[in-house]
């Protein structure tokens, strides 16, 4: 098990010591078990020098003897290449990149560019929101129970109709393979060599997700999902902080 955290580059966290306090607080909360520290988002769009100082800060902490690896999140291919080179000058290898990646993710073309760079540089590609906030788990032929959250209810209602064909395909494959819709959607991520980060709140969800690794999508199943995904024009919202 690897423990990872994300440190946010808030405006007041600047310079080569901006992450010292939140890093030490995280380390304390996690009982000194912290394997990966990620920059939560790129500041390239509005304050590019800030993230360089904060990454220098993480490199300094490693030089001081703290044992962890550095990761990035919500970053585009151009900025990723620059930061890989930046870290290399500090003799540091980037461990991971965390990106929104699912059948409903926006800008999948850009995500695939990031994935290619990760593969070429032996960087782990972490796929967050692989179930698109649970939308891909909704049974296309049944009315789901109302969620406790008003925001989630509104989200589900807005996406039910536009994603119907995609969810129907997920259900068909799930039925043929005797698995859940969630497993199919997650397996789509695994098929492409990513590491999906799945949010789980219930024991039943943990058990279900653990079974993802007992089977693999077939090539024809993957292709069908790809085709239907492309036809689905209602994608998840873009992360406003994601860089180019």
What does each of the following model-derived ranges do?
Residues 3, 26, 34:
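Hydrophobic/aromatic pocket-lining and membrane-interface residues
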Residues 18, 22, 37, 187-188, ...:
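Generic alpha-helical secondary-structure signal
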Residues 29-46:
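Active-site groove signature of glycoside hydrolases
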Residues 1-11, 37-40, 98-103:
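A short, structured active-site edge motif that brings together acidic residues
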